[in-house]
UniProtKB/Swiss-Prot annotation:
Region (Disordered): 1-25, 89-111
Subcellular location: Cytoplasm, Nucleoid
Role, per record: Binds to DNA and alters its conformation. May be involved in regulation of gene expression, nucleoid organization and DNA protection.
InterPro entries (alphabetical): YbaB-like_sf, YbaB/EbfC
Homology family: Belongs to the YbaB/EbfC family.
UniProt keyword terms in alphabetical order: Cytoplasm, DNA-binding
Subunit structure: Homodimer.
Record GO terms (molecular function): DNA binding
Chain segments annotated as coiled-coil in the UniProt record: none
Protein name, entry field: Nucleoid-associated protein PSEEN1789
Pfam families per the UniProt record, alphabetical: YbaB_DNA_bd (PF02575)
Length: 111
């Protein structure tokens, strides 16, 4: 390989690394909302999986033990929904960055 070709490859690799770092920061700061119970419970979470806010509809607030279990299940479901949305957002964004790469099916990037 000629000297100029290697320098070009190094420059491309550096540009790709910079784009990946920027994309990772955008993903980490992105906020998603997970919901359950038709919106009765919602959770706002960042790409870093930090929970920013939990909202519970007033209709779910009671002292009945059965309602408590339902509420716990709805909170767990909303959290899981938010995590799935973060994963999908990450796959979508990174997929557009790696579209030109010849990666094997199912290959996960280390981020």
């Amino acid at each position: 390989m000629m000297k100029g070709g290697m320098a070009g490859l190094m420059k491309q690799a550096q540009q790709m690394q910079e784009k990946m770092q920027k994309m990772q920061e955008e993903l980490a700061n992105a906020e998603v909302t997970g919901q359950s119970g038709g919106g009765l419970v919602s959770v706002v979470m960042t790409g870093r999986h930090d929970v920013k806010r939990v909202s519970i509809d007033q209709s779910l607030m009671s002292t009945d033990a059965d309602d408590k279990e339902v509420l716990e299940d709805l909170i767990a479901a909303a959290l899981n929904d938010a995590v799935r949305k973060i994963e999908q957002n990450s796959q979508d964004k990174m997929g557009s960055m790696t579209a030109g790469m010849q990666l094997p099916p199912g290959f996960k990037m280390p981020f």
